Amino acid sequence: MYIAMNRFKVLKGSETDFENLWKNRDSKLHEMKGFRTFHLLRGPVNETEGYTLYASHTVWESEDDFIAWTKSQNFRDSHKNAGTGKVLTAGHPRFEGFSAIEGA
């Protein structure tokens, strides 16, 4: 099992727009081999720096399945409008990938 996460620093006041963007997107994940599940996670608010932390969380059967997704036409189609609208985040997302330890 492989878990892929992107962490986003969403500017305070932009949380609803950010969540709606994800809710209304045309996701192609379910069409991909090895895809198991997706969750958008809301984390803590950082009052000092003015953002709310979010993470997109996907679970895949393998890292190879995730990599195939990132190289697919479905990935390109799903991300074709990224960065074209109102600025909702402080900087680019931060990717983190994890392989599950079998038997742990």
Language model segments and positions:
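Short hydrophobic/aromatic beta-strand micro-patches
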Residues: 9, 41, 57-59
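Short, surface-exposed ligand-recognition loops at beta-strand->loop->(often short) alpha-helix junctions
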Residues: 10-18
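Solvent-exposed beta-strand sheet faces enriched in polar/charged residues
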Residues: 41, 96-98
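Short amphipathic alpha-helical/adjacent loop interface patches that line ligand
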Residues: 22, 26
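An amphipathic, aromatic/His-enriched active-site/gating alpha helix that lines ligand/cofactor pockets
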Residues: 27-36, 51, 59-96
